[in-house]
Amino acid sequence: MKILWLSNIIFPQLCREIGLNPPVGGGWIQSGAEALIHQKNDLKLGVVSFYKGKELRVFKQFEITYYLVPEHTTRNSVYDNQVELYLKKVNTDFKPDIVHIHGTEYGHSLAQVKACGSHHTIVSIQGLTSFYKNYYLGGISEREVRSKYTLRDIIRRDSLITQQEYMAKRGELEIELLKSVHHIIGRTSWDHSCVWSITPKIKYHFCNETLRNSFYCFKWSYDKCKRHSIFLSQGQYPLKGLHQIIKALPLISRDYPDTEVFVAGNNFFSSIPFYRKNGYANYVHKLMKENNVQHKFHFLGQLSEEKMVEQYLKANVFICPSAIENSPNSVGEAQLLGTPCIASYVGGIMDMVHDNETGLLYRFEEIPLLANHVCRIFSDNILAQKLSVNERKVAALRHNKETNTSRILEIYKEVAAE
């Protein structure tokens, strides 16, 4: 069987071949591809990724056949018609039995269906842009957003409001895609409900994700963690909820003044020139000063897979404070390692975290409850260890490589038989 994947990221293996830095967090999709190939010896896999180049590039020297397709979009033009022509060439060259589109967020997913039709085509849900757009500002009012406009925002016409509008445009393409295909793969009751609301007759297939390899190899230990430390996997735009942690920190610090927050990603507000600072950076910087907590935050830069594991293991608690998520890999990774988790009760997180059993939940806007949850884990090592043990059990089942690979092969066979 020949399977052609469309991916939003360039696989790390190909990045190394062409001299690019591997994408942060992109290793999970390559891990899934490798598990698929190793479990099914007669399967041939091709992967299409997209880049800002000028020509179609093909790499056939690996176990996976890679295609790099030029794609040029802007905030004003979110769909590149030329991509359809390139994808026709790719499909003619590879001749897939099944096309598996990973993600609905970008125009190239729709381009595949427009170019080659929806027969024997499956779309996997990652995030859902058409719904995420409603939460992009993370509860910050438009008035507050507009008051924090920066020189960069004005010159580049790239404020948080315009970013939200850009997401809405991509959401329109996403809806068109979902209405054009017959098979969807999802993994939460939230994504199931969202897809059902758009196209109720579509065939929904359930399948969990396989995570990056390193996260299966280590185990969090209370005795080895850094006490009163919080880890966040990202925070550079408002949907991810960094500002909620800033608001909670004075309450946490009242009981635990030595609390520190470690954030994967670059410092985007105090270590860059003013002319590169965006509105959210302005908002975050001011909020930190108002709460006198800027000294408690440590931005770690772009972290490799191994460094991410290291930070999860060091943390006393991991928090996912997002305004919306489907099934964030960061929560899955933390649970697989056993790092005690706190997460906002949004989107598909309800299917990943059972309150007081495999993590602690709070409503996104409930800052006192978030702060209290952190203090509970800091003060109660028995609770922390209970959560850790339970998380590892449920995550090991959810992210089991063999189970998930077998399930995806079942779906491929079912679709191919039509």
For the regions a protein language model found, what residue spans apply to each?
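Membrane-proximal helix-turn-helix segments that form the acceptor-binding/catalytic region
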Residues: 145-183, 193, 197
